[in-house]
Amino acid sequence: MDGAGSLTRSFFRSLRPQADLKAAAIGAVVLLREWVQDKRRERLHAARAAAKDKIKAKAVVEREPPPRVVALVERYLPRRVGISMTVLLLIGSCGFGIVKGGHLQDFVTAISDARNAMANSAGFRITSVVINGRKQLTQDEILAIGGVSGRSSLLFLDADAVRDKLKANPWIADATVLKLYPGQLMIELTERKAFALWQEAGRLSVIADDGAVLEPYVSRRFLSLPLVVGKGADTQARDFLALLARYPQVNSITKAAIFVGERRWNLRLKDGLDIRLPEQDVGNALAMLSRLDKEDKLFSRDIVAVDMRLPDRLVVQLSEDAAKAREEQFKDKKKKKAGDAA
């Protein structure tokens, strides 16, 4: 038993060095393989990095140099200034597009509406409007003329601009605009009065005493106004109609005053009779007409025209029937004279 056991222990001792050598060999192989793989990875990484550097270098080489102006701007212009200029350029482009496209008024209106909306929200809404001196125009018409709407705020309302707009209307001679905070607007008006109707080139207009055209004649409420006709009659009407009013015998039956050649006046009476007044001394001519009508019933006679243009005579034109009757009367007189002579 002791001999067999000794033999076995001797056998296993002889095998240990062989196992250690084999394990060492396997470890060396593994380390070698890892070292080779690491080298391969390093070479691959280096190759990729070289390729990237080559591409970058190629891109840098192939890039065209910037223009001189751009280079100077990039070199000397601060970065923030460049950004500001870019923003200004964009704003300018937008503004040019708005103006070119015809949207400027819409843009201004939108800005004004937004501003007024904020002011109205803050308590500056126009809640009361007082208008004094209004006769011909309604309150809505006056506010529309002045550019005051329901969106307007008292805070941003330009009183001078409203006044100028009101005075631009022919009916308004003068205006005063007051803003009473927080929400009252007061307007004092001096209106022109309708003075006469003026007919020229087929158009009929209502005019003031200074000749300003107030509006086209569309309302019959002005039918009672005196009528003047002809070029220049609008500015000369005040003086002539004032003179005519001094002779009610003629004025009361006058239908229209016609300004002829911008020099003198004709009268068209209501029965169609034409009175041709002289260029000078019109007052004496009107006085003569009044006297002849009182004494001789001139305006009741069968005549169609009275010509007073000549200073030393008055010419009367008979109607066609009156002229024929007068001609027959002359013929009868001639026959009677011829019979008496025989």
UniProtKB/Swiss-Prot annotation:
BP terms from Gene Ontology: division septum assembly; FtsZ-dependent cytokinesis
Membrane topology, as annotated: Single-pass type II membrane protein
Transmembrane segments: 81-99
Localization terms from the record: Cell inner membrane
Keyword Cell cycle in record: yes
Gene3D superfamilies from the UniProt entry: Cell division protein FtsQ/DivIB (3.40.50.11690), membrane protein fhac (3.10.20.310)
Ranges of residues in domain POTRA: 124-192
Cytoplasmic side: 1-80
Stretches of the chain found on the membrane's Periplasmic side: 100-342
UniProt entry keywords in alphabetical sequence: Cell cycle, Cell division, Cell inner membrane, Cell membrane, Membrane, Transmembrane, Transmembrane helix
Gene Ontology CC entries for this record: cell division site; FtsQBL complex; plasma membrane
UniProt similarity note: Belongs to the FtsQ/DivIB family. FtsQ subfamily.
Function per UniProt: Essential cell division protein.
Annotated protein name in UniProt: Cell division protein FtsQ
Record organism: Bradyrhizobium diazoefficiens (strain JCM 10833 / BCRC 13528 / IAM 13628 / NBRC 14792 / USDA 110)
Chain's gene name: ftsQ
